[in-house]
Amino acid sequence: MREQLLAVERVQAIEWRDGALYLLDQRLLPHRQTWLRFDHAAEVADAIRDMVVRGAPAIGIAAAYGLVLGARARLQAGGDWREALEADFARLEQSRPTAVNLFWALQRMRERLARLKDDGEVLGQLEAEAVGIHASDREANLTMAQLGMELIRKHQGNPQVVLTHCNAGALATGGFGTALGVIRAAHLEGLLEHVYVDETRPWLQGARLTAWELAGDGVPVSLNVDAAAAHLMKTKGITWVIVGADRITANGDVANKIGTYQLAVNAMHHGMRFMVVAPSSTIDMSLESGDDILLEERSGSELLEVAGQPVAADVPAVNPVFDVTPADLVDYIVTEKGVIERPDSTKLAQLMCRKRLH
């Protein structure tokens, strides 16, 4: 399966070359593929905040490279560069509050930095750490794709019909995707009949990104409005809902793109399986439950325009970006360390003690 996935690799969102970070501007997809160059930590933080790059693993990778850029500038400026670098840590941490991969990646960079005493080694070592985070996520994607595909094979009768939400693909990660990695692997193994993709308002990550990724790979895919999901579950033979995650707490609660919670409720009602695919860096054992997660809300202005024209201009809009799916609605959590069925705090703790499978 690894070789099959590598053979069809087509999309990347992040590149590090010649000492600079390049990000595919996801706000412009699918109409334009524009790469932007970043040379400063503040620019990377703004790119994360403004959704040039999005998806929990990709945000973490971008932040790690952003810290390298910050360290380079601080070293060149001289003086107490370590203290000055704290401003870059803070700005990157504040860019998006919900995706724990951001904080995990920056903590890895901080720990590597703390071990370095020779200023001459700092840039090379921090760059190696960031490149390692990027490469590790790609390997995790491959492992999760295999594990998730095997779950689908285990339950397969006829080819399966899948519903997915938002974008948990190559554009959201350093590799092939989390949820879409599983979907890609299942397609390559002939286990999929069709994939339905929620459009995922208001940024339309499903319509602009996921449908584009899957169609480009030859996966049979249809786009639907978010509100049609329950109807499709009832009428289209859907057997799996497969999503990614931005944060998973110690008890197995899952924070993901707004609309995920209602998919899980409807999946349970209709008797279909609900799979969450995320690297172990998404699991936050410091938070007991989803009630402890800081859930990002974005400006209501994102909901008050259609094609650049104002609608309901005098009405306030509520725009939560994430919701929390309780663990008891989740059938499987798939990570690079293994699979948890019916997650709870004991199973999550045991998983986090394991070494990676790849």
Curated annotation (Swiss-Prot):
Originating organism: Ectopseudomonas mendocina (strain ymp)
EC number(s) recorded for this UniProt protein: 5.3.1.23
Name of the protein: Methylthioribose-1-phosphate isomerase
Family statement drawn from the similarity comment of this UniProt entry: Belongs to the eIF-2B alpha/beta/delta subunits family. MtnA subfamily.
Primary role: Catalyzes the interconversion of methylthioribose-1-phosphate (MTR-1-P) into methylthioribulose-1-phosphate (MTRu-1-P).
Gene designation per UniProt: mtnA
GO MF annotations in UniProt: S-methyl-5-thioribose-1-phosphate isomerase activity
Keyword Isomerase: yes
Pfam families: IF-2B
